[in-house]
Regions:
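A shared catalytic/ligand-binding motif for oxyanion handling
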Residues: 1-181
Length: 181
């Protein structure tokens, strides 16, 4: 981590996630970042959602979660899927109860692909953010990058400028705006 950009304040390591509490060096904005690797076993979904909800309870501030959740929200996020499953409902409940936003995906419809026999594709990798995280970072986008070796497409989460409020008064700006320069 570049200490010129972020200061690490705290860390929580869970069974399916690792979370870091960060402070922006330039703007003092404190937020949580969580990397997720969801379970492959349907019986462990409750454990994941409880683990992540405990992170949220400990750090009730701006939050960004990124990773392989190993589940989808809607049937259209998996090729050939037509019905909702209990895992989907649990994921949707987690997103709603924590007031998270699933950022739109640019560049592809799916993030995971298997081409052995019948092709299988789904959007199990994603970035979820809290509203105050999204408001702080301008022009947030989530984009699929080129897949090289893995069966997962890498994601690029990009944020533009940081919201800093009103800019400081500068005499030169006033003089220029009045046409003296």
């Amino acid at each position: 981590m570049d200490k010129r950009v972020f200061e690490k304040l705290d860390v929580i390591a869970g069974q399916f996630s690792i979370s870091v509490l960060l402070r922006g060096v330039v703007d003092d904005f404190v937020w949580a970042c969580t990397g997720v690797y969801g379970p492959n076993d349907d019986g462990q979904w409750t454990t994941l959602w409880e683990e992540l909800s405990q992170v949220r309870a400990r750090w009730p501030m701006a939050w960004c979660l990124v990773g392989d959740f190993n589940t989808i929200r809607y049937p259209n996020e998996r090729l050939g899927c037509d019905l909702f499953s209990p895992a989907m409902f649990a994921f949707l409940d987690f997103i709603e109860s924590n007031s998270l936003v699933d950022l739109p995906l640019e560049g592809a419809s799916f993030t995971w692909f298997r081409d052995s026999g019948l092709p299988s594709m789904s959007r199990i990798d994603k970035a979820l953010v809290s509203l105050n995280w999204e408001e702080h970072f301008e022009n947030v986008s989530q984009r699929v990058l080129h897949r090289v070796i893995s069966d997962h497409y890498p994601l690029l989460l990009e944020a533009g400028a940081v919201q800093r409020g009103r800019s400081a008064f500068k005499f030169e700006n006033v003089v220029e705006s009045l046409g003296f320069c």
